[in-house]
C-alpha cells in the first residue's frame, strides 16, 4: 500500500524563530535571495506566490520579499498576490517584478519598457535621489544589475522616489509609513555591488532581525522535529557515502539512536574504494548500524543499453527503493525512509513558477508505489550549510569536506550506455584527479571536481601504434552554494600532471579535455 510523504514540521511555522519569507515569482535568482538573508543569520525560504494572508499570519514572518520574475503584471495570466497581505503590517520589499506588482496592486502604473523607452538589461548606475533607510551606508551612485522588460511610470500614492538611473526614472521607491519598499534591480546577485548592504538594511533596520539563526539552532530544532515525527518507530536511511547522507545519518543517530538502521547499497556505480571507506568511517567511527548490500548486478543489468540520462536516474531511483523494500521486509516495523535531499535539489527539479532543469535523483526518481514515508531533514539547506551542520555535529573535516557525489553515482558521469569498461575509466581517472588535487593543496579551494567519460572516442598514438580510445573530461568548479558556479582556474602544471597520469595509467583513454563552462548555462554534473 502506498504511503504519503511525511511533511516535517516546517521551520517557517516555528514562532520562536525570526524569518523572512520570499514569495516566488519565477526569477532565476529567487533562491539566492533566501541564501543571502541566511548569510546574515536570519532564516529565510521561498514560498509560493499563491500563499494566503492567513498562511502568512501562521508563519509570522518579520519581513516579506517579493521576488523578480519573467512575467508582466498586466498580463491575463500574471502571478498575483493575496492583497490582504498588504494589511498585515509586515515590511515588504519588492524586487524587479515584485516592485512592479506592488505598484500595480497599490494604484501606480506599469507599462512595457519599450513604450517608456527605458528597457534595461545588465549593469547600470543607480543614483540616489533621497535618503532612505534601505540604502543607508551606500554611496549616492552605485552599480546595480537591472533585468526588466517593463517599467514603473507612476508610483502609488504614499510612495516617494528614492533612486533612478539613466534609463529608469523609478528605480527605487518607498512608503515608510507602511514599510513598503520597491527596487527595480537585483540586490541578491554579486553584480549589484552594494546588494548585500541593501538586503541587510531591510533585514535588520527595517524588519528588526536579530541575526541569531545558526546551525546550532537548526540541530536542536531538527532533533526535536525528528523525535516528534518518528516517535518510537524505526527509520531506514540509504547511505551513499556522500556528505549529505552521512550528515543525515549522524543527525538521525543523535535524534533517535538505535531506531535508525542504515542500508548502504553498493549499486556498482561507486568511486574507487568507496564502499570500504563508508563502512569504516560511519560504521566504525560514528557507530551507525549499517547493512551493506551488494546490488551491483541488479542495477547494472537494468541499466544495460540505457543511454538517456533521465531514464538512468529513474531506473536508479526506482531500484534503490526496491532494494530498500527487499531489505526492509527482513526488518520489523520500519516506517520511514530518510534522504539527503537539499534545497538546491528541490529548486533544480522545478517549482510551479520555473522550469525543471533536470529530474533529481532525490526528488523525481522515487516510484509512485514507494513503501516508506519520507523524511528529508536537510531539504531547507544549501550545500555549504550542510557542511556547517556536519561540523556542528562534530564530524571531522575529511567527512564534511568530502567531494559531493550524486545518488546515481558514476552513472551520470558516463555519457551514453554504461559498461564495465567505461566505469573503470571513470573510477581510475577520478581517483587520480582527487589524489593530485589534494597533493597540490587545492582540495579546499575547489568546491567540486570529478571526471566524466564523454562517450566520445578519438584517434591517438601510443608507442608506435594508433589508438582509438575514450576522451575523459575533467570538471572542476568553484561555488558557494551550488546554485551558481564558475570553472576552477587550476594551475596548468597541475592539469598537465593529471592528464599525463590518466592517459598513462588508465586503460582505454587517450585524450583529456577540461570543462570551462560556468553554471549557468551548464549544470555541475554532465547528466
Curated annotation (Swiss-Prot):
It holds the Pfam family GATase. The active site is at residues 96, 186, 188. SUPFAM superfamilies: Adenine nucleotide alpha hydrolases-like, Class I glutamine amidotransferase-like, GMP synthetase C-terminal dimerisation domain. Its EC number is 6.3.5.2. Residues 213-402 form the GMPS ATP-PPase domain. NCBIfam families: guaA_Cterm, guaA_Nterm, PRK00074.1. PANTHER family: GMP SYNTHASE [GLUTAMINE-HYDROLYZING], GMP SYNTHASE-RELATED. This is GMP synthase [glutamine-hydrolyzing]. It comes from Streptococcus thermophilus (strain CNRZ 1066). The lineage of its organism: Bacteria, Bacillati, Bacillota, Bacilli, Lactobacillales. The gene is guaA.
Amino acid at each position: 500500500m502506498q504511503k504519503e510523504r511525511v511533511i516535517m514540521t516546517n521551520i517557517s511555522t516555528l514562532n520562536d524563530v525570526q524569518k523572512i519569507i520570499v514569495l516566488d515569482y519565477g526569477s532565476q535568482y529567487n533562491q539566492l535571495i533566501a541564501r543571502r538573508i541566511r548569510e546574515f543569520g536570519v532564516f529565510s525560504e521561498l514560498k509560493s506566490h499563491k500563499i494566503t494572508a492567513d498562511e502568512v499570519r501562521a508563519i509570522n514572518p518579520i519581513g516579506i520579499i517579493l521576488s523578480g520574475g519573467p512575467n508582466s503584471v498586466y498580463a491575463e495570466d500574471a502571478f498575483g498576490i493575496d492583497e490582504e497581505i498588504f494589511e498585515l503590517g509586515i515590511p515588504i520589499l519588492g524586487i524587479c517584478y515584485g516592485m512592479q506588482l506592488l505598484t500595480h496592486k497599490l494604484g501606480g502604473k506599469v507599462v512595457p519598457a519599450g513604450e517608456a523607452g527605458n528597457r534595461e538589461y545588465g549593469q547600470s548606475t543607480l543614483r540616489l535621489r533621497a535618503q532612505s533607510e534601505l540604502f543607508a551606508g551606500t554611496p549616492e551612485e552605485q552599480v546595480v544589475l537591472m533585468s526588466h522588460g517593463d517599467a514603473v511610470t507612476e508610483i502609488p500614492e504614499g510612495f516617494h522616489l528614492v533612486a533612478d538611473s539613466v534609463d529608469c526614472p523609478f528605480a527605487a521607491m518607498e512608503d515608510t509609513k507602511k514599510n513598503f519598499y520597491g527596487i527595480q534591480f537585483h540586490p541578491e546577485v554579486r553584480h549589484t555591488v552594494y546588494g548585500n548592504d541593501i538586503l541587510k538594511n531591510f533585514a535588520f533596520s527595517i524588519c528588526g532581525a536579530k541575526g541569531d539563526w545558526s546551525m546550532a539552532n537548526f540541530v536542536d530544532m531538527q532533533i526535536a522535529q525528528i523525535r516528534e515525527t518518528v516517535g518510537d518507530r524505526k527509520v531506514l536511511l540509504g547511505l551513499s557515502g556522500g556528505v549529505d547522507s552521512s550528515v543525515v545519518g549522524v543527525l538521525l543517530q543523535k535524534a533517535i539512536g538505535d531506531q535508525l538502521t542504515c542500508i548502504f547499497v553498493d549499486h556498482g556505480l561507486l568511486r574507487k574504494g568507496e564502499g570500504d571507506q563508508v563502512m569504516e568511517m560511519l560504521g566504525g567511527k560514528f557507530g551507525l548500524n549499517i547493512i551493506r548490500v551488494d546490488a551491483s548486478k541488479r542495477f547494472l543489468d537494468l541499466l544495460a543499453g540505457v543511454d538517456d540520462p533521465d531514464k538512468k536516474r529513474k531506473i536508479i531511483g526506482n531500484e534503490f527503493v526496491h532494494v530498500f523494500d527487499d531489505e526492509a521486509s527482513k526488518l520489523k516495523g520500519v516506517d520511514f525512509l530518510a534522504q539527503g535531499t537539499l534545497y538546491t535539489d528541490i529548486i533544480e527539479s522545478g517549482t510551479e513558477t520555473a522550469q525543471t532543469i533536470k529530474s533529481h535523483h532525490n526528488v523525481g526518481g522515487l516510484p509512485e508505489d514507494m513503501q516508506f514515508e519520507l523524511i528529508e531533514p536537510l531539504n531547507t539547506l544549501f550545500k555549504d550549510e550542510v557542511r556547517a551542520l556536519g561540523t556542528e555535529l562534530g564530524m571531522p573535516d575529511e567527512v564534511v569536506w568530502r567531494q559531493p557525489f550524486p545518488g546515481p553515482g558514476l552513472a551520470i558521469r558516463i555519457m551514453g550506455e554504461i559498461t564495465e569498461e567505461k566505469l573503470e575509466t571513470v573510477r581510475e581517472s577520478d581517483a587520480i584527479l582527487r589524489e593530485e588535487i589534494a597533493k597540490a593543496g587545492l582540495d579546499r579551494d575547489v568546491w567540486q571536481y570529478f571526471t566524466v567519460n564523454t562517450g566520445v572516442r578519438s584517434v591517438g598514438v601510443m608507442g608506435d601504434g594508433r589508438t582509438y580510445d575514450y576522451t575523459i573530461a575533467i570538471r572542476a568548479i568553484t561555488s558557494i552554494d551550488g546554485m551558481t558556479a564558475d570553472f576552477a582556474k587550476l594551475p596548468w602544471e597541475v592539469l598537465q600532471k593529471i592528464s599525463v597520469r590518466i592517459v598513462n595509467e588508465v586503460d582505454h583513454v587517450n585524450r583529456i579535455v577540461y570543462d570551462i563552462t560556468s553554471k549557468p548555462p551548464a549544470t555541475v554534473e554532465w547528466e
